[in-house]
Amino acid sequence: MKRYYYELMGEDYNSYEAAIPDGRIKARAIAQAKRAMRDLGIRRALLVVNSMRTSNILDIITVELD
């Protein structure tokens, strides 16, 4: 069962149009966010984790490329 949906955002909280599948495994979403960041040429972004049930923000994860 999918518990979270993800949104990739810049540090100014503007959304990038990156397709990160819904799911329940955050590590997989982070890996997909990094792949999208490489494609978009972004070095640092925020991965927002939202609840499927309430649509509330549960976590904001800073993602950086090495």
Q: What are the roles of these predicted feature ranges?
A:
Residues 19, 23-44:
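A short, charged, amphipathic alpha-helix used as a generic interaction element across diverse proteins
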Residues 37-66:
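Short, mixed-charge low-complexity intrinsically disordered segments
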Residues 13-20, 54-60:
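Surface-exposed loop/edge segments in extracytoplasmic proteins
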Residues 1-18:
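Short aromatic-glycine-(Arg/Gly/Cys) micro-motifs in beta-strand/loop hairpins
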